[in-house]
Amino acid sequence: STIALRTMCYSDLISYPWFAPAGIPNGLVTGVSRIGYLRGELGTATEFVDAPLTDGDRIQFALSKINAIPFIDGSGYVIFSQTTSAAVDSELASINIDRGVKYIKRGIRKNSKVFLFKPNDQRTRDQFKAFVDAFLSELVTLRCLFDFATLCDDSNNTSERVAKKELWCDVAIQPITAVEFIYVPITVKKPS
């Protein structure tokens, strides 16, 4: 929806693409005063019906992979989930992880062009690995990744791949997930 796109742009403006565009303040929805639906037939007079979300609606939305936009007292309408259509057990089921992975792929692809047509030897592989490591290290600092590992040597750049004029760099990442639930168990003890 245009609401979600505008909210993602706002979230990127105040943080990074790998921060969840949900919650307060990243998920604040602007320009919306009511949420509901139109009742009536197209081409005839219609009526706007307010449809505030109930807790049951939010549960159903979550099960259907629809991100809820409830009204939060003191803040207004807020996108309050960040589900994608990916499989539930996938890390890519969260918008912030999916966008972080896309940012990484684009950043490496965009900046790797300087390595094209260089000699396909270990020195070039070492330089390429150093570039990828530096890029990913910055993303650790910027709270996109917990950790990463890269491999760019003879084990994944076999003689067959070199003969096909290919350079391979395997990357494994451990992205930082967003807090979606907070639990605060409180224990009351009798005075001693």
Model-derived regions: residue spans:
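Structured, hydrophobic secondary-structure cores that serve as assembly/anchoring elements
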Residues: 1-192
